From Swiss-Prot:
Location(s), subcellular: Cell membrane
Annotated membrane topology: Peripheral membrane protein
Name by which UniProt lists this protein: ATP synthase subunit alpha
NCBIfam families per record: atpA, PRK13343.1
Positions marked as site (Required for activity): S365
Species this chain originates from: Anoxybacillus flavithermus (strain DSM 21510 / WK1)
Binding site for ATP: G172, D173, R174, Q175, T176, G177, K178, T179
Biological function: Produces ATP from ADP in the presence of a proton gradient across the membrane. The alpha chain is a regulatory subunit.
Catalytic activity: ATP + H2O + 4 H(+)(in) = ADP + phosphate + 5 H(+)(out)
Keyword Kinase part of the UniProt annotation: no
Domain of life: Bacteria
Length: 507
C-alpha cells in the first residue's frame, strides 16, 4: 500500500495563500448607551465625537437628532415613536445631518417633515436630498423685490401688496380667517408658474384634510406640496416642519422658479421648541421660551429671498402665521416675527364677526416692500386707500357721539362705508388683478357714491360680468392685463357710465 507523502513546502504555500486572501472588514462606529428616555427626549452616554444637529440611530431603527452636547451625556430629540426605546439601548452616530428629499416628484403630495408620504398614494420617487439647515442667500446674491405676487384678495393686493421674495406675516386670533387667506392665495397662483408649499404645524388632521380637499377641488394641488406635522405628532416633528418646507422650496428657487411657502403657524412651532428646550433643561427666558427663540424664526424666514439674475432670478416668498391671544400683538412671539418680516396683515376678530371678511385691520397692517412690486394700474387707483380706510375707522367711532356732522365728514363716512363693502370678498373667490383695478377705480373716482351701500356687492358682481361680455370692457381688461397700466381714463369712465345705466338699484 502506497503511503501518501505530504510535502512541507506545499503546506506552507497553501497557508501563505490563505493568509494573503484573508480580508478583515473592521467596522468602526461611534456607539453610545441610552441612560434616560421619556417625553420624546433621550440622554445617551458615550457618543464623544457627535456633532450638534447630527442624526443618530437607535437600536430599533428610530432616528434622533443630537441637540444638547453636555459634559457627560448627549441630549437627543427622538424623531418618531419613543415607546420602543429603553434605558441601556445602543445608539450610534450616522455621520449625517438632517436631510429631506426634494424634487418635482413631491408636487401634489402630502408628506411629513421627514419627506415621507402620508397621503396613501404610494412611495415618492426622488433622487435628491437637501440638508434642512442651510445658510440663507447672501447680500450680493439677492435683488430688491420688484415682481408682484397676486393673492387675488382685493384688500391685500390694494392695501398691503406682497412681492415675490417678500416675507409677510399674517397675524390674528384663532378663527379670524388666516388659513383662508393662505388657501385663496395658493388657489390664485394657478397658471402663474408658481410652486406653493403649505406647511401645517400642530393643526388638527381634519383641518389639514379640509385644506387638501379644497386645494384639490380648485386644481391647486397640481402645483402644491403639503407638509404636515399634526397636533398628535411628537414636538420634534413640529419643530422641524417649517425647515423641511423651506428646504423643499429652495430646490425650486435655486433652479430659477418662483415659490410661495405658507407656515401655518409659527406660534405652534415656538411652543414645540419651548417644550423641547425645557425637557433638555435649557434655561428658560421670557414666557418660558428659550433664549434662542428669535434665532429659531429668523434663520427660517431669512431663507426667503428674491435671487439676483446671476443666481437664476428665482424667488421664495414666505407667509408665516402667528396666532395672538385676544388681539395682543405686543406679546413675545408676535413682536419677534413682526421685527423679522417685511410687513404684517393683522386680522381682527371684531371685524370678522361684524361680517367684514377678510377681516383686515387697515391701520395696523403694513407692507414694507410690496408697494414696489404693485402693477402701475393698482398703484394709481389704490394710492391713498389704506390711509383713507384707517381714517374712516377713526371717524366712524367719533361719529357715534356726534349727531350734526359737516358735509365733508359725511362724504368721508359715505365713501368709507362703500370702501369697506368693495373690499369684502367671498371664500375661495380670488379675483384677477384687472378686475380688482376696475372696481377700485370705480370706487376711488366716485362712481359708487350714489349707489346704496347694500347694493355695492351686487354692483361689483354684475360689473365684472358686464366687463367679460361687453366688447369695450374686454378691451379695457386686456389692456390692464398685458401692460399693467390703466387704459385711457376717458374710455374707462365711459365704460363705467354705460354699465351704471343698465344697473338697477334695489328698492
Amino acid at each position: 500500500m502506497k503511503c501518501m507523502s505530504i510535502k512541507a513546502e506545499e503546506i506552507s504555500a497553501l497557508i501563505k495563500k490563505q493568509i494573503e486572501n484573508y480580508q478583515s472588514e473592521i467596522e468602526v462606529s461611534d456607539v453610545g448607551t441610552v441612560i434616560q428616555v421619556g417625553d420624546g427626549i433621550a440622554r445617551a452616554h458615550g457618543l464623544d465625537n457627535v456633532m450638534s444637529g447630527e442624526l443618530v440611530e437607535f437600536a430599533n431603527g428610530v432616528m434622533g437628532l443630537a441637540l444638547n452636547l453636555e459634559e457627560n451625556n448627549v441630549g437627543i430629540v427622538i424623531l418618531g415613536p419613543y415607546t420602543g426605546i429603553k434605558e441601556g439601548d445602543e445608539v450610534r452616530r450616522t455621520g449625517r445631518i438632517m436631510e429631506v428629499p426634494v424634487g418635482e416628484a413631491l408636487i401634489g403630495r402630502v408628506v411629513n417633515p421627514l419627506g415621507q408620504p402620508v397621503d396613501g398614494l404610494g412611495p415618492i420617487e426622488t433622487t435628491e436630498t437637501r440638508p434642512i439647515e442651510s445658510p440663507a442667500p447672501g447680500v450680493m446674491d439677492r435683488k430688491s423685490v420688484h415682481e408682484p405676487l397676486q393673492t387675488g384678495i382685493k384688500a391685500i393686493d390694494a392695501l398691503v401688496p406682497i412681492g415675490r421674495g417678500q416675507r409677510e406675516l399674517i397675524i390674528g386670533d384663532r378663527q379670524t380667517g388666516k388659513t383662508s387667506v393662505a388657501v385663496d392665495t395658493i388657489i390664485n397662483q394657478k397658471g402663474k408658474n408658481m410652486i406653493c408649499i403649505y406647511v401645517a404645524i400642530g393643526q388638527k388632521e381634519s383641518t389639514v384634510r379640509n385644506v387638501v380637499e379644497t386645494l384639490r377641488k380648485y386644481g391647486a394641488l397640481d402645483y402644491t406640496i403639503v407638509v404636515t406635522a399634526s397636533a398628535s405628532q411628537p414636538a420634534p416633528l413640529l419643530f422641524l416642519a417649517p425647515y423641511a418646507g423651506v428646504t423643499m422650496g429652495e430646490y425650486f428657487m435655486y433652479k430659477g422658479q418662483h415659490v410661495l411657502v405658507v407656515y401655518d403657524d409659527l406660534s405652534k412651532q415656538a411652543a414645540a421648541y419651548r417644550e423641547l428646550s425645557l425637557l433638555l433643561r435649557r434655561p428658560p427666558g421670557r414666557e418660558a421660551y428659550p433664549g434662542d427663540v428669535f434665532y429659531l424664526h429668523s434663520r427660517l424666514l431669512e431663507r426667503a429671498a428674491k435671487l439676483s439674475d446671476a443666481k437664476g432670478a428665482g424667488s421664495l416668498t414666505a407667509l408665516p402665521f402667528v396666532e395672538t391671544q385676544a388681539g395682543d400683538i405686543s406679546a413675545y412671539i408676535p413682536t419677534n416675527v413682526i421685527s423679522i418680516t417685511d410687513g404684517q396683515i393683522f386680522l381682527q376678530s371684531d371685524l370678522f364677526f361684524s361680517g367684514v371678511r377678510p377681516a383686515i385691520n387697515a391701520g395696523l397692517s403694513v407692507s414694507r416692500v410690496g408697494g414696489a412690486a404693485q402693477i402701475k394700474a393698482m398703484k394709481k387707483v389704490s394710492g391713498t386707500l389704506r390711509l383713507d380706510l384707517a381714517a374712516y375707522r377713526e371717524l366712524e367711532a367719533f361719529a357715534q357721539f356726534g349727531s350734526d356732522l359737516d358735509k365733508a365728514t359725511q362724504a368721508k363716512l359715505a365713501r368709507g362705508a362703500r370702501t369697506v363693502e368693495v373690499l369684502k370678498q367671498g371664500l375661495h373667490e380670488p379675483l384677477p388683478v384687472e378686475k380688482q383695478v376696475a372696481i377700485i377705480y370705480a370706487l376711488t373716482r366716485g362712481f359708487l357714491d350714489d349707489i346704496p351701500v347694500e347694493d355695492i356687492r351686487r354692483f361689483e358682481k354684475e360689473f365684472h360680468a358686464w366687463l367679460d361680455k361687453d366688447e369695450n370692457g374686454q378691451k379695457l381688461m386686456e389692456h390692464i392685463r398685458t401692460t399693467g397700466d390703466l387704459p385711457n381714463e376717458e374710455d374707462f369712465n365711459k365704460a363705467i357710465e354705460a354699465f351704471k345705466k343698465t344697473f338697477v338699484v334695489s328698492e
